[in-house]
Amino acid sequence: MGLVEFHSGAIDESIQHYQRAVSLEPRSYSGHYDLALAYLKAHKLEEARTQLELAVSLDPRRADAAYDLGVLLLEMGDPSAALIKLRQARALDPQRADVSFNIVRAQLESGRVNEARTEARESAKRFGSDFQWNAAVGQLFLEKGQAKDAVPYLLQASRVRPEDTEIRHQLALAYLESGQANEVLDTIPTAETSDDHYMRASAYYIAHRFPEADQESQLALAMAPENPAILILRTRLLQRAGEQDDALVMAQKAITLAPNWDEPYYLAGVSYYFIRRYEQAEASLARAVELNPKSARALFLESIALANLGKVEDAERCLRQAIRLQPGDARLHCHLGILLARKNESGAAEDSFRKAIQLKPDYGLAHYELGKLLVGSQQLRPAAQELELAVKDDPGLTAAYYQLARVYTKLGEKEKSQQALAEFERLYQQEAHDSRAVDQALDDDARRATELR
């Protein structure tokens, strides 16, 4: 009776019948298993878990109960426990593609990325011709931020069903997110839809083929003028072209269409920053961080905007938060050093500059800032060495030549001083105040950070 009511949609009544059945036969595998399915249908997950655990304990040779319990544990946020049950189900029935898929899923959700890669690779030997398995595993890797791992499975799915447009687009997206621009263009050789144009434009963008990216993105926007992703790409292209006002228009439209997406707020903050509207930049970037607290790039640029507003303590807080998120980013350590130097915390600033150089030995700005700091403490020879490295690593760092000329003068190396000053004047083509040159160097460094996608 419970089964009839279950299939007729009378879930509450079927639960009552199954409850009576298991009270009469408490050791009935099918009774507990069917009651679990009814609880699942009613979204009563804890009750379903209890019944599935009873079913598994009553008959550990049944793959269905072990599998369903594993999937339920995944849904309840316990991937490690789910993995045990899913492996149990596979041992009982190794031919099930759904079990293989969910093992990979459990491994990814528990942070065992290498195990997931191995599992998928081994399972492909058995399910490699299965379209659904390949498509599902590829999409799973893509959703979990492992685009490069998604490629072989989506590629195989596309080979099995070359006419499947959705899989072709998923494959193109995996190529795009793993930085394989040429493969995107090969996957979508001609554009018929706005998505096609967007994918091709994005591929040209990451390949630094900006004229083609501009053309394709305009075609995409003409076909889908209210697509936030296309608007964001147009914003980036306009920013690279220095058209910050037009970029802001695009970013603001994207904000209207996707108010809970951090990206348009971040890009609006970028444009506000480069047109020196620091208060608006800080507000927009703060909103981006609110929506995505793990956005180190938004925290970085927010810190620079705050510093320009004279809010050094708030700027330092943002930078330290960014460093906690990305401790291996040399730029963050360098700019923290700049802030600390402004606060006259020379020892801590020096530590930050040296950390930046350790992470990125050819980072010209870090060498420059360290050299300038050493000048202040009269360590002239080490300062000269750092400034020499600065101009070697970044020949366009004009302020470094100015500082180097001053240091050489103090060291009594007149010829070297004249050469450094001549190079400074050649780059500037006129006398320039050191602080203005430094501001330009910081702006250039910030711009490079915004261009890292």
Model features per residue range: what roles?
Residues 24, 58, 92, 125-127, ...:
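Structural marker of alpha-solenoid helical repeat scaffolds
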Residues 304, 331-376:
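Alpha-helical adaptor scaffolds
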Residues 7-20, 41-54, 75-88, 109-122, ...:
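Structural signature of tandem alpha-helical TPR/SEL1-like repeats
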Residues 11, 29-30, 63-64, 79, ...:
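Helix-start (N-cap) detector for alpha-helical repeat units in TPR-like alpha-solenoids
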Residues 176, 192-193, 392-394, 398-433:
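TPR/TPR-like (Sel1-like) alpha-helical repeat modules
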